[in-house]
Amino acid sequence: MDPVDPKLEPWNHPGSQPQTACNNCYCKKCCYHCQMCFLKKGLGISYGRKKRSQRHRTPASLQDHQNSISKQPLSRTHGDPTGPKEQKKEVASKTETDP
């Protein structure tokens, strides 16, 4: 083993840099090309910027449809609030007249 100059940084030591440039191939040989290729291709770890996912905007025709629905009055599915009171009064009046 050849002695290494102590003044050189570790990334400049002979043999620390691969002789060929990195490429986009994912074969076994290229995955083990260098540490960066191994992390990126072999393990699937990349530290680059993540792409923002675009929110899908609704077309104008659908927005108009939603606006028209919200302007309509809400229908009451629970029944008329005056209904049960009147029924109780009717039941009470029937029981009073029957005896």
From Swiss-Prot:
Binding site for Zn(2+) 2: C25, C27, C30
Annotated binding of Zn(2+) 1, by residue: C22, H33, C34, C37
Swiss-Prot/TrEMBL keywords: Acetylation, Activator, AIDS, Apoptosis, Host cytoplasm, Host nucleus, Host-virus interaction, Inhibition of host innate immune response by virus, Inhibition of host interferon signaling pathway by virus, Interferon antiviral system evasion, Isopeptide bond, Metal-binding, Methylation, Modulation of host chromatin by virus, Modulation of host PP1 activity by virus, Phosphoprotein, RNA-binding, Secreted, Transcription, Transcription regulation, Ubl conjugation, Viral immunoevasion, Zinc
Annotated spans, Transactivation: 1-48
Keyword S-adenosyl-L-methionine: no
Basic and acidic residues bias (residue ranges): 77-99
Maturation and modification: Asymmetrical arginine methylation by host PRMT6 seems to diminish the transactivation capacity of Tat and affects the interaction with host CCNT1.
Residues of the site described as Essential for Tat translocation through the endosomal membrane: W11
Compositionally biased spans, kind Polar residues: 60-75
Residues bearing the modification Asymmetric dimethylarginine: R52
Span list, region Interaction with human CREBBP: 1-24
Cross-link (Glycyl lysine isopeptide (Lys-Gly) (interchain with G-Cter in ubiquitin)): K71
Subcellular location: Host nucleus, Host nucleolus; Host cytoplasm; Secreted
Gene Ontology biological-process annotations: DNA-templated transcription; positive regulation of transcription elongation by RNA polymerase II; positive regulation of viral transcription; symbiont-mediated perturbation of host chromatin organization; symbiont-mediated suppression of host innate immune response; symbiont-mediated suppression of host translation initiation; symbiont-mediated suppression of host type I interferon-mediated signaling pathway
Pfam families per the UniProt record, alphabetical: Tat (PF00539)
Superkingdom of source: Viruses
GO CC term (a single one): host cell nucleolus
Region feature (Disordered): 48-99
Region (Core), start-end ranges: 38-48
Region (Cysteine-rich): 22-37
GO molecular function, one term: trans-activation response element binding
Task performed by this protein: Transcriptional activator that increases RNA Pol II processivity, thereby increasing the level of full-length viral transcripts. Recognizes a hairpin structure at the 5'-LTR of the nascent viral mRNAs referred to as the transactivation responsive RNA element (TAR) and recruits the cyclin T1-CDK9 complex (P-TEFb complex) that will in turn hyperphosphorylate the RNA polymerase II to allow efficient elongation. The CDK9 component of P-TEFb and other Tat-activated kinases hyperphosphorylate the C-terminus of RNA Pol II that becomes stabilized and much more processive.
Other remarks in the entry: HIV-1 lineages are divided in three main groups, M (for Major), O (for Outlier), and N (for New, or Non-M, Non-O). The vast majority of strains found worldwide belong to the group M. Group O seems to be endemic to and largely confined to Cameroon and neighboring countries in West Central Africa, where these viruses represent a small minority of HIV-1 strains. The group N is represented by a limited number of isolates from Cameroonian persons. The group M is further subdivided in 9 clades or subtypes (A to D, F to H, J and K).
Protein family: Belongs to the lentiviruses Tat family.
Name of this protein: Protein Tat
Organism placement in taxonomy: Viruses, Riboviria, Pararnavirae, Artverviricota, Revtraviricetes
